[in-house]
Amino acid sequence: VRLTSRDASLTNQDLSMSDRSLRATATTAAAAAAVVFAGPALAQSTIDKMKQFKVATTDLNIPTVQQGGPNAEAIRNNLKKIKLPEGFRIDLFAIVPDARHMAVGPSTNMLFVGTRKTTVWAVTDRNSDNVADEVKSFAPSLGFKVPNGVCWTKDGFLIVVEHNRVLNFPAAEFFYEGPDVAVIEVAGQGKLIPPEEESFNHGARTCRVGDDGKLYITLGQPFNVQGKDKVAMYEQIGIGGMVRMNPFDGSGREVVAKGVRNSVGMDINPKDKTVWFTDNQTDGMGDDTPPGELNRITKPGGGGEHFGYPYIHGNNVQIAGTAAAPDLKDMKPPAAWTKPQVEFPAHQAQLGMTFYNGKQFPAKYQGGIFVAAHGSWNRTKASGGLIDFVSLKADGSADKHEVFAEGFLDPETGSYRGRPVDVAVWKDGSILVSDDYAGAIYRISYRP
């Protein structure tokens, strides 16, 4: 049975919250629907035209999102309840419906934001005051499907990873004003995973381009725990793990991590170039087990480093043979499986992460990791809705972790004021935090 992930954001509460931004996104939804419901043939015709720099649409009315009004004021009031270390403050950077993973533009004051729906947002701070001036739909003629993952190549090409397609936009920062944008198909529709393995569950991808020039992509597996018949196939394909490939044509694909349940966040340490990722673990085993994970890939070759799932969670929580996975009772992890760098409290749903390489924050944060905890969805008492900070040792391994920002979860009512998804370092060394529940992006800055 496929179960809803704790990463799922379409709860009844979320739907009511989304009503506030419905008017702002209605035009976007209509434009996307025109492509999606016209069928695959029209969608492919559109991308074929864009690959050849031809006009795919004559509609220049690109949907934008209002940045002021009652919704913005309500969000600002909620931000007054967020607790931060001394000297830090949090402000509203932009209203961005369904905001998920972020990619800060390398050449401009722009931010590209993925969603779990049908839109990628282009966010612009034109006057460099660290507040967005414009939020508009990016490449609306394409008709995206769960374009959650966004990242940059070394030469400034924007990668968008959908549920089962990977696109490369060579000049996203400069051609975003129009509905048609030059595009390269890295992996065409149905080529990232076998179409028969597509699912509504655990389908949000994330990406980074490594120091080796390869595109790294996380691939969640769709079950709470996959059946015995799926284990070997998933490990071979990279479902429930991570793959890497050429970011321009998808060639040279290989599995670099397996034994992963559902990673929805990754980053690369700029110092030693190792790849790190979060992993959300099995539901239904209890409120306080199993722990969430922060992992580090140290042996990417040889068919992929194994991180224990679906046999063991964390350092020693058994899953194979338990009520969650009875048909795996005779299966064991490889002898050399890799333990997590950090165990997080169970079901907090740590998602996006970033290494802090800015210069604004105090020395203790330099080179460390900020991690967004989306918050639990099926725990008896809700947990999460915060930003963690993980410091590193001299050898590059994880040292300590602590809560950096909290208050997105109301401790008295157990309801969410916001649900952090991703963290990114902004131009001035502050950090941005996306929130798909409030439909916003926040900026956390420091002043002694």
Indicate residue ranges for each PLM-predicted region.
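Conserved beta-propeller blade signature
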Residues: 110-113, 157-160, 214-218, 274-278, ...
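Beta-propeller domains
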Residues: 111-131
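Short loop/turn segments immediately following the C-termini of beta-strands
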Residues: 107, 115-116, 163-165, 171, ...
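Beta-rich, blade/repeat-based domains predominating
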Residues: 96-109, 141-157, 193-214, 258-273, ...
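Beta-propeller domain segments
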Residues: 45-85, 204, 221-229, 233, ...
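Asp-box/WD-like beta-propeller blade repeats and closely related beta-sheet repeat scaffolds
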Residues: 163-209
